[in-house]
């Protein structure tokens, strides 16, 4: 075991100072609340702002200590789920600034990994009449797949212990423990850790989650190298991220980011095994026999139990055949279906028929998750019935139509490579009818009255995307709508 000790250090020689004095700088809190600012100023321009505001931090700390934690108001119990009560707003402000600071080591590693692998920054992941190339290249050759939800640590102190290998500044870790202890159920084993990670200061907990995942995946890579003499085709580490390089703030982001986060990790590939992390799941796939998949399943279980102190049952990790199981990946339900074809051949006087079976990638639009996403942002109800977008009713006709059109176009571009587009047509119909209902609400009329007054031809244009010849007599906003299309 001693000969492996150097490898198990897990790049801990790359420890970084936390730059603890950054907590006293004002622009840190501006970065914490305005994600549109360019965070590279922390990496490239160290001397961007040398202005310290000790007075602000002293006030925050003093107010934290002046809080009487013995006085609990029942009315405040639902105000702030991370710090329990609304009176801990000062602690939350400091924790958000602290989260920006501790992202610096991870941001440096992310930038260096992108430069080393020469990965091009992609601002728009779109599938225009095709699917993603690696799905077409890899899926037809795979037989078995297993998607396992990565368990959260049973105690948050494990995350702090993991993070201390990345940094040298112990005072920062003590401050981190202070923030974590502010959570009322910090030591509770009953509270689901997934709720803590998803709803309570997601930036800070995502950072801790990244440190936890990077350590366990480094050990997983070590196990792979020790169990196989074949060289890896490729390997690399990406981080789960909330904010990517730059994104326009529009309604389609609300639909996709909340339910289809594009945080992907293609950790390693060898001739027989593929590993990818997506949406907090470890996805293992193989074109070999199930024996190899079973071996890796027990690798994962033992690693979680021995390293992260998380109890996991191997019997609850299923190995599925791609021909009988759909994999939720990149917003598609992907599976392999046999494509049977009959070939008739003739040799001299003898004729024969051959059945030729080929694998074909089948990609489906996930209709139920998409309807759930649209229901969250109030485009429809839980059953998929379109409703008006009340928050947009105060906008101009052109803005309302343009917003709905933008969402429909993005959905069409992304899912145009799907094998079956019936679900996509239903989603587009929900959005277009929601657009009509929003316009009717804006003009304070019923949908039927609005349709009669406007004309069925232009409504058909909105609902079904057909060109019309009667748009010359329409209001100016609808002329803009035709120009946009």
UniProtKB/Swiss-Prot annotation:
Name of one Pfam family that matches: Intron_maturas2
Name used for this protein in its record: Maturase K
Species whose genome carries this gene: Malus domestica (Apple)
Places the protein is found: Plastid, Chloroplast
Family to which this protein belongs: Belongs to the intron maturase 2 family. MatK subfamily.
GO terms of molecular function: RNA binding
InterPro entries: Domain_X, Maturase_MatK, Maturase_MatK_N
GO cellular component entries: chloroplast
Keyword GTP-binding: no
Gene name tied to this protein: matK
Keywords, in A-Z order: Chloroplast, mRNA processing, Plastid, RNA-binding, tRNA processing
């Amino acid at each position: 075991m001693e000969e492996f000790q150097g490898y198990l250090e897990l790049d801990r020689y790359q420890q970084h100072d936390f730059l603890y004095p950054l907590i006293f700088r004002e622009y840190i809190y501006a970065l914490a609340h305005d994600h549109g600012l360019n965070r590279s100023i922390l990496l490239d321009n160290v001397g961007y702002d040398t202005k310290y505001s000790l007075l602000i931090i002293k006030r925050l700390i003093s107010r934290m200590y002046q809080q009487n934690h013995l006085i609990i108001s029942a009315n405040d119990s639902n105000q702030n789920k991370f710090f329990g009560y609304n009176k801990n707003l000062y602690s939350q402000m400091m924790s958000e600034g602290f989260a920006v600071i501790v992202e610096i080591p991870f941001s440096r590693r992310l930038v260096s990994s992108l430069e080393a692998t020469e990965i091009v920054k992609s601002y728009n992941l779109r599938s225009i009449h095709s699917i993603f190339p690696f799905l077409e290249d890899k899926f037809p050759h795979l037989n078995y797949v297993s998607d396992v939800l990565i368990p959260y640590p049973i105690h948050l102190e494990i995350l702090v212990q993991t993070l201390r290998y990345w940094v040298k500044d112990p005072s920062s870790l003590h401050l981190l423990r202070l923030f974590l202890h502010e959570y009322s159920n910090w030591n509770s084993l009953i509270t689901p850790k997934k709720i803590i990670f998803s709803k309570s200061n997601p930036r800070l907990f995502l950072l801790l989650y990244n440190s936890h995942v990077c350590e366990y995946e480094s050990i997983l890579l070590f196990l792979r190298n020790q169990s196989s003499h074949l060289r890896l085709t490729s390997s690399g580490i990406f981080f789960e991220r909330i904010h990517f390089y730059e994104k326009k703030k529009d309604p389609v982001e609300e639909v996709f980011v909340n339910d289809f986060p594009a945080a992907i990790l293609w950790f390693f590939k060898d001739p027989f095994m593929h590993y990818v992390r997506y949406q907090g799941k470890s996805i293992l796939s193989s074109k070999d026999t199930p024996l190899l998949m079973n071996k890796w399943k027990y690798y994962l279980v033992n690693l979680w139990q021995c390293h992260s102190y998380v109890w996991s049952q191997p019997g609850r990790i299923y190995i599925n055949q791609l021909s009988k199981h759909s994999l939720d990946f990149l917003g598609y339900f992907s599976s392999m279906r046999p494509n049977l074809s009959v070939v008739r051949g003739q040799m001299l006087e003898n004729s024969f028929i051959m059945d030729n079976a080929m694998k074909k990638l089948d990609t489906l639009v996930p209709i139920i998750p998409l309807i759930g996403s649209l229901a969250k942002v109030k485009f429809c109800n839980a059953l998929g019935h379109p409703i008006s977008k009340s928050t947009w009713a105060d906008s101009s006709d052109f803005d309302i139509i343009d917003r709905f059109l933008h969402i429909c176009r993005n959905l069409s571009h992304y899912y145009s490579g799907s094998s079956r587009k019936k679900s996509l047509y239903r989603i587009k119909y929900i959005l277009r009818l929601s657009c009509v209902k929003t316009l009717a609400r804006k003009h304070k009329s019923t949908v039927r009255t609005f349709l009669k007054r406007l004309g069925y031809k232009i409504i058909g244009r909105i609902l079904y995307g057909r060109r019309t010849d009667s748009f010359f007599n329409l209001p100016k906003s609808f002329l803009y709508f035709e120009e946009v299309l």
